[in-house]
Amino acid sequence: MVQPAPTTGTDVRTAVAARGLVKVYGRGDAAVRALDEVDVDFAAGRFTAIMGPSGSGKSTLMHCLAGLDSADAGEVHIGRTELTALSDRELTRVRRDRIGFVFQSFNLLPALTAEQNVLLGLELAGRAPDRAWFDAVVDRLGLRDRLRHKPSELSGGQQQRVACARALVGRPDVVFADEPTGNLDSRSGAEVLDFLRTSVRDLGQTVIMVTHDPVAASHADRVVLLADGRVAGELVRPTADTVLAALKHLGDI
């Protein structure tokens, strides 16, 4: 059963929150209200999926939450930091130091080894890696024997695992995953989803994922449902069947 989404205030257990979020593309008669007064919280240490029909605003919401796009109105908070009040320089620092990203495309540099790709963000930020944490992430992902390999020597699933390790190695407050299994076969996709699940359960990570796949969403603790730029409800402890039923109710299928 689809439950109404809560609209409680930001607290220490909330990793990410949006309040009154509005995003409009275009002007005049051609204007599209991609986000329409969105209020939503994402709990720390949980795996949340964002789903909805095509054009529902799910990717726009994630981009605004992650500071990749600016909202026209409303607030976004990462912990107690209001992203919408930051300068461009401050926002860049937050994205670099407190947010991890996993995209559909792996975005690995072909000339670097897997280990160099994992550590690249820290190197660019001038931060020394925590080798114990690096080892824990690499071992959880099963990359120990692949660290000296370049992307061309890795399968798609292995490349996405490298991308996951890169997102986690800096101990971010939250990892945003945008269709992380979109370029993978079903087996490799399942491996990546299992790791995201494990990173929450065993490493205490917070993961927010946009996906169109009910099976992928079933790995999450919670699914936030969007329709026409608004939060339409949520599912707790989702299964592929309950997600599919919710999407049918929203008119996606």
Q: What positions do the PLM features span?
A:
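Catalytic Walker B motif of ABC-type/P-loop ATPase nucleotide-binding domains
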Residues: V175-D178
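Conserved ABC transporter NBD signature motif
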Residues: G74-E82
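Conserved ABC ATPase signature
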Residues: K150-Q160
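Short coil-to-helix segment of the ABC ATPase nucleotide-binding domain corresponding to the Q-loop/switch region
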Residues: L112-L120
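ABC ATPase NBD coupling module
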Residues: R27-V32, L83-G100, L124, D241-A245
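Conserved catalytic motifs of ABC-family nucleotide-binding domains
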Residues: R171
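Hydrophobic anchor residue at the start of the ABC signature
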Residues: C164, V192
